């Protein structure tokens, strides 16, 4: 059986989901996997030794502080004209690859063009998506253009996702749904998207105890451990690293915290970047789930996958969404609303504010209760298994 997996290449969350799904599909029958993606996603797949097919990049312009540059992004896309050309080129590549490979199933993770290509070739298709409604940041100079672009994306993308034979949203059921705002759509879409829960490669019960994992990392069981994997697009990472690492280094010394930072650089392996006092910075953490279970608090940028993984492992979070990144901002505010996280805006970052937030997350029982409940719910769900079974079923006709 051949599977054509088409994840969005911005960041690593989408490709990791597809990698998990391929492993679960192989529990049912032998599967050859072909990953058609771009950007960081393509680099990750190549590094992992999987079959990687490059498609045309889609880039988002960023400011030096990690903020999404809405005006420049729209301008570089020719206010839609260049974007149409990019879509056409990507569609041609997908059609060419699919025609050559002859896949039994196409799996798109937030890549609408692959769904279109699959339907043009009459191939069965599964779609994974958690952001169905796109909110574009509203800047005064670009207000009209932003509104038009937002309306156009909702009107275009929604029907494309529905072209797939099955559409899955990898998120918690209510009241713990993190992508709730991004799923608010006209009634036409009601019942067309299936909430299946978080997609995990490893479940908490498959790993050793938190105490044992801490000891393996050189941390005493009673010492508070903070884990900060630097996630998101490569253009937004440098500013956040320069801002947060000195703050955490001072807090490690002042508060007696242990901190592990991963720079999100799989190309460098698990090489130690530097170590100072209670803070250890690595280029990449191979066993993300071991560090997640070992930690007491996760610091992340509001990415959907990272939030769901932390909730599944019972870990409260400090979320720092990038400026003007509406999806991560909405994810973060929703996580705060359900009681599993505190949120700091990027301009609020300082030793005092971060220290206060971490103390609350470590000490206040309300956070432990909320993540305990989300962990219980996650233990009853198997999103990867549900999607894998449906993909194999569709591939088998």
Residue ranges and their predicted role:
Residues 9, 27, 31-85, 229-232:
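Conserved nucleotide-sugar phosphate-binding/catalytic loop shared by glycosyltransferases and other
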Residues 380-397:
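C-terminal alpha-helical cap of glycosyltransferases
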Residues 70-105, 112-113:
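Conserved nucleotide-sugar donor-binding subdomain of glycosyltransferases
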Residues 22-27, 201-294:
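Donor-nucleotide binding loops and adjacent catalytic segments primarily
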Residues 105-109, 135, 287-330:
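A donor-sugar binding/catalytic signature common to diverse glycosyltransferases
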Residues 145-235, 264-267:
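A nucleotide-sugar donor-handling region in carbohydrate enzymes
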Residues 342, 347, 352-374, 397:
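Conserved donor-nucleotide binding/catalytic region of nucleotide-linked donor-dependent transferases
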Residues 7-19, 234-239:
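A short, glycine/small-residue-rich beta-strand->loop->alpha-helix junction that serves as a flexible
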């Amino acid at each position: 059986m051949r599977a054509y997996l088409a994840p969005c290449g911005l960041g690593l969350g989408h490709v990791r989901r597809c990698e998990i799904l391929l492993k679960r599909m192989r529990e049912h029958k032998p599967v050859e996997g072909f990953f058609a993606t771009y950007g960081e996603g393509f680099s990750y797949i190549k590094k992992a030794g999987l079959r990687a097919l490059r498609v045309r990049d889609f880039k988002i312009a960023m400011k030096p502080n990690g903020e999404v540059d809405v005006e420049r992004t729209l301008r570089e896309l020719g206010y839609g004209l260049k974007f149409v050309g990019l879509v056409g080129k990507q569609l041609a590549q997908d059609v060419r690859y699919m025609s050559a490979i002859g896949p039994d199933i196409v799996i798109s993770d937030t890549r609408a063009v692959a769904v279109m290509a699959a339907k043009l070739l009459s191939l069965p298709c599964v779609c994974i998506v958690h952001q169905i409604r796109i909110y574009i940041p509203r800047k005064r100079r670009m207000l009209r253009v932003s509104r038009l672009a937002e309306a156009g994306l909702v009107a275009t993308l929604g029907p494309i996702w529905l072209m797939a034979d099955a559409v899955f949203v990898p998120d918690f059921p209510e009241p713990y749904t993190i992508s709730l705002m991004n799923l608010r759509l006209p009634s036409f879409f009601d019942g067309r998207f299936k909430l299946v829960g978080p997609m995990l490669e490893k479940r908490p019960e498959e790993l050793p105890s938190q105490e044992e994992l801490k000891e393996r990392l050189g941390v005493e069981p009673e010492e508070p451990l903070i884990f900060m994997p630097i996630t998101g697009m490569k253009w937004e990472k440098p500013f956040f690293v320069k801002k947060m690492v000195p703050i955490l280094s001072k807090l490690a010394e002042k508060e007696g915290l242990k901190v592990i930072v991963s720079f999100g650089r799989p190309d460098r392996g698990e090489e130690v970047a530097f170590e100072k006092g209670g803070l250890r910075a690595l280029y990449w953490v191979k066993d993300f789930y071991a560090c997640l279970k070992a930690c007491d608090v996760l610091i992340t940028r509001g990415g959907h996958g990272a939030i769901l993984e932390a909730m599944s492992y019972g870990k409260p979070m400090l979320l720092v969404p990038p400026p003007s990144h509406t999806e991560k901002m909405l994810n973060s505010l929703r996580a705060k609303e359900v009681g599993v996280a505190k949120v700091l805006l990027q301009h609020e970052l300082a030793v005092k504010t971060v220290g206060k937030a971490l103390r609350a997350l470590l000490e206040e029982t309300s956070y432990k209760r909320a993540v305990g409940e989300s962990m219980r719910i996650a233990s009853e769900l198997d999103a990867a298994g549900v999607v894998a079974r449906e993909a194999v079923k569709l591939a088998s006709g």
